[in-house]
């Protein structure tokens, strides 16, 4: 059994905002570099392997994560004021705030379980089944979508449904032929042909309209690949 614990604190991750003013050193558009985009990534990972018999192995992997934004972000933009003669007569400062505190990091499952059974009934033959389960997968989203304009939007992004899939693998090492080591293999991915959401974008530019709530009907989703096969032959010399 192997295990690990991690606690990673990301401080001031890069986030910029474009501001169009009609003035500014860069013409019509300036860039604000925001501060306070912090993330906390904490989790545990456990991996175990048990040989029940010389022909039977059992594997189990657990990954439990808790990844979220820690604190809000903000940035100030100072715009020069000009008179009709294009002379500076003052300046105006605008503060931009982003409601990020407590929101979950998206685009990857934070919880996963993997169970595997490997059979080796005869010399050179290996048959394996792997069942993978994914949970706590929050949609991908950008911190700049949480700019405060009136009431702060602090609702969590849409979380995709949990899902599992079964992969099957078979390999057989052929007897040596003319000094060549050859192995044939066959793989069946998503053997149960499950339909699942593999990735999602919260309030996407294509689906996020109308009520703008963080729900499935406003998300852009990408389904996982249906059942598919792979055959292979490897040669070592």
Where are these regions (language model features)?
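Short, glycine/charged-rich beta-strand-loop motifs at protein surfaces that mediate ligand recognition
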Residues: 4, 154-160, 171, 219
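Gram-negative outer-membrane beta-barrel transporters
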Residues: 6-11, 32-143, 234
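Solvent-exposed loop segments that connect transmembrane elements
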Residues: 15-33, 70-102, 139-156, 198-219
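Conserved long hydrophobic alpha-helices within structured protein cores
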Residues: 53, 57-59, 63, 160-168, ...
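C-terminal beta-signal and adjacent terminal beta-strands/loops
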Residues: 124, 133-144, 172-237
């Amino acid at each position: 059994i192997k295990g690990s614990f991690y606690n990673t604190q990301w401080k001031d991750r890069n986030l910029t905002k474009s501001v169009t003013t009609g003035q500014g050193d860069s013409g019509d558009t300036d860039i604000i570099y925001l501060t306070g985009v912090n993330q906390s990534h904490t989790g545990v990972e456990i991996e175990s392997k048990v040989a029940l018999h010389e022909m039977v192995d059992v594997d189990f992997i657990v990954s439990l994560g808790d990844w979220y934004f820690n604190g809000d972000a903000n940035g100030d933009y100072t715009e020069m004021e000009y008179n009709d003669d294009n002379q500076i007569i003052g300046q105006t400062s605008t503060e931009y705030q982003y409601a990020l505190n407590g929101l979950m990091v998206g685009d990857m499952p934070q919880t996963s379980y993997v169970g595997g059974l490997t059979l080796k009934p005869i010399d050179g033959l290996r048959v394996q089944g792997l069942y993978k389960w994914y949970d706590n997968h929050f949609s991908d989203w950008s911190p700049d979508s949480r700019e405060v304009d009136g009431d702060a939007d602090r609702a969590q992004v849409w979380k995709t449904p949990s899902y599992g899939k079964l992969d099957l693998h078979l390999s057989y090492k052929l007897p040596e032929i003319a000094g060549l080591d050859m192995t044939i293999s066959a793989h069946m991915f998503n053997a149960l042909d499950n339909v699942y959401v593999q990735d999602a974008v919260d309030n996407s530019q294509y689906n996020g309209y109308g009520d703008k709530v963080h729900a499935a009907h406003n998300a852009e989703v990408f389904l996982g690949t249906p059942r598919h096969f792979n055959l292979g032959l490897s040669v070592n010399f």
